[in-house]
Amino acid sequence: TGTMPHQHGVEINSLPLPQNMPTIGSILRNAGYETYYIGKWHVPRCFPQGTDEIPGFFNDPIQNNPLGEFTDKEIVDKVISYLKKPKSKPFFLTVSLQNPHDICHWIMKDKTQFLEKYSPKELDSLPPLPANFAINEEPEFLKIIRQPKDYGQETKYTLKWKEIDWQKYLYAYYRLTEKLDSDIGKI
């Protein structure tokens, strides 16, 4: 939309975008473009306005399988197939891959299942922590963030982490980012 959440009213993932809200998709469509959106879309009960789905794909794959490990491959394959087809007019395509968002699942699911492949095999391969990692006294805003709430519970899983846990987290995050980079390269 080009507007801030407080302007369009979608301040959390569970709120829909107003139906009359212009989007880049609707503006470009009105200018004669074919407009498509594929991938992660965290706004309920509405399809990205001003866009078409790539046929056979947009059925809220994230809700059915929230892990990018599975959905990103399907998204990339569909996008590549779409891009190979001849176009009769200019197009605008938004591709919203899930990763590196899987890092949240890595935290919450105790690094189980397939996410193990993003865990280091040897400790000497762990990245160093940033110079500003150590905090002498936790700032007030961090104390507020760590309080129980309906959304964003990831912090409760990290409260007792040691430095090595954070290094493993960074390692996994870097691998997921590399996977994203690889997927973009395929497109």
Give the location of each predicted region.
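Active-site-proximal cap/lid insertion segments
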Residues: 85-87, 97-187
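Catalytic-site neighborhoods of secreted/periplasmic enzymes
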Residues: 1-93, 97-119
